Amino acid sequence: SLALASPKRPADLEQMPEDSPSEVRAKERAWSNIRKEQERDIQTIAADVWVGAFLLPKTSGADIPTTSLLEGLANGFASIDEPAVAAARAACRAAGVFHWPLRFPEAMAEGGFHCVLGNPPWEKIKLQEKEYFSARCPAIAAASNTAERTHLIQLLKEGKMSHHQEGTEGAPAPWEQTLFRQYEAALRLAGAESLFYHVPAQDGGRFPLTGVGDVNLYALFAELDGQLRRPDGRAGFIVPTGIATDDSTKAFFQSIVQGRQLASLYDFENKELFPAVHKSYKFSLITLS
């Protein structure tokens, strides 16, 4: 695990005026300079190395960060120019990794945000082949069963799917092989994310209460919302009612109830409020305090 101290932003940034366009631009430039400094800060580098170790493919000869490298960075006796550092940081950029304590140090220094509002995505981490290919390759998404879909994906890998469907022969289609590589990368990333979310609390896990079973993003965000608020702050979010009833989220819900953090829970049926969601689907508005 990796413990991060909250870095301080220059105090004068918050004091800079922003009453005119020129003052706003000046403050933006100052903030941009601070972000560049943060990117070179050892804490940011170490955080990227920690997360990047989960994201990188574990293949022979790959530059994978190790515990000794992370400890070396944290204690100042490892070089930031190590190939594994560059690989980890590149993986973090590609995945859109966001380190909250390092991006909002002034809020974290005060124990968190006064208010956190969320409307998280309601989707599972596990890559769903039908959903993935629905817009990218409808023929695969429309396959009548899993066996047929798996066969078409294999043909996609070989660049022969279109030939197979049309009953023709010819050279492999580059676009098919490119799409397969993209699918393979997305599949591996989903697996890496799942591994990261399932790290137990004793090993520095980020989501000890909701990183359970077939993880859904809404549950992770619900736990994150609670982590980001300060002890006297509030958090509010809209999530499926499963947050209070599902077995995979029972530890989280039990925690907020026993900790007297649950200020309110209003449960609704969709009733066509959200056309893309079935009208019988239930969701809840939850407030933590």
Each PLM stretch: what is its role?
Residues 1-100, 243:
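Nucleic-acid modification enzymes, centered on SAM-dependent nucleic-acid methyltransferases
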